[in-house]
């Protein structure tokens, strides 16, 4: 596998750190008033999902992670596993609940998701940036409700709970930003 110098670090680069594949979230070059410059790098461990911050001096190298990202279409959940398919080769992937647990509320049938494979095993799933979900349960809207800073909690048809404006009612379809779990507008 390739080795990467800290000069080559950029957001999204996949590297091996402590025997686990990690993705760089942020790379900051720090030049103290006295002493040698160093890089403060924020990583996301692709296996555990934890965020790590490490510092590296110039001249250090890290091994690249042998991970593969595939665009797969979400098909269905059979109760125990989530089924995905490659839309080009029609190869199917069955992914366990542990891998899917953090994003299962954003999985909508037929949507294309990015599935990261390491040693031919799925280790993470990235849903589309925005999904359309239906409001399953929320407090009823009152006459005169308008868009404002306040909101109310709403449960979506997939089980996700998020803050929505006061005018949203049960049965409405809303656009949700999956990166920050926020209401993004009406569908």
Curated annotation (Swiss-Prot):
Signal peptide: none annotated. SMART domains: EFP (SM01185), Elong-fact-P_C (SM00841). It is found in: Cytoplasm. One of its GO terms (molecular function) is translation elongation factor activity. May be beta-lysylated on the epsilon-amino group of Lys-34 by the combined action of EpmA and EpmB, and then hydroxylated on the C5 position of the same residue by EpmC (if this protein is present). Lysylation is critical for the stimulatory effect of EF-P on peptide-bond formation. The lysylation moiety may extend toward the peptidyltransferase center and stabilize the terminal 3-CCA end of the tRNA. Hydroxylation of the C5 position on Lys-34 may allow additional potential stabilizing hydrogen-bond interactions with the P-tRNA. Involved in peptide bond synthesis. Alleviates ribosome stalling that occurs when 3 or more consecutive Pro residues or the sequence PPG is present in a protein, possibly by augmenting the peptidyl transferase activity of the ribosome. Modification of Lys-34 is required for alleviation. This is Elongation factor P. It comes from Vesicomyosocius okutanii subsp. Calyptogena okutanii (strain HA).
């Amino acid at each position: 596998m390739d080795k990467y110098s800290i000069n080559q670090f950029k957001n999204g680069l996949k590297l091996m750190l402590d025997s686990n594949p990690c993705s760089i979230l942020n790379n900051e070059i720090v030049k103290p008033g006295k002493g040698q410059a160093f890089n403060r790098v924020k990583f996301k461990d692709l296996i555990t999902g934890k965020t790590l911050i490490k510092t590296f001096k110039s001249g250090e190298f890290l091994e690249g992670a042998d991970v593969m990202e595939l665009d797969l279409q979400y098909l269905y959940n059979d109760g125990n596993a989530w089924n995905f398919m490659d839309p080009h080769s029609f190869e199917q992937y069955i992914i366990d609940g542990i891998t899917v647990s953090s994003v299962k509320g954003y999985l909508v049938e037929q949507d294309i998701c990015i599935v990261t494979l390491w040693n031919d095993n799925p280790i993470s799933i990235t849903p589309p940036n925005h999904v359309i979900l239906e409001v399953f349960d929320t407090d009823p809207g009152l006459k005169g409700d308008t868009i404002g800073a306040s909101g109310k909690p709403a449960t979506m048809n997939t089980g996700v709970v998020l803050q929505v404006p006061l005018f949203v009612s049960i049965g409405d379809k809303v656009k949700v930003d999956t990166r920050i779990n926020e209401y993004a507008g009406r569908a």
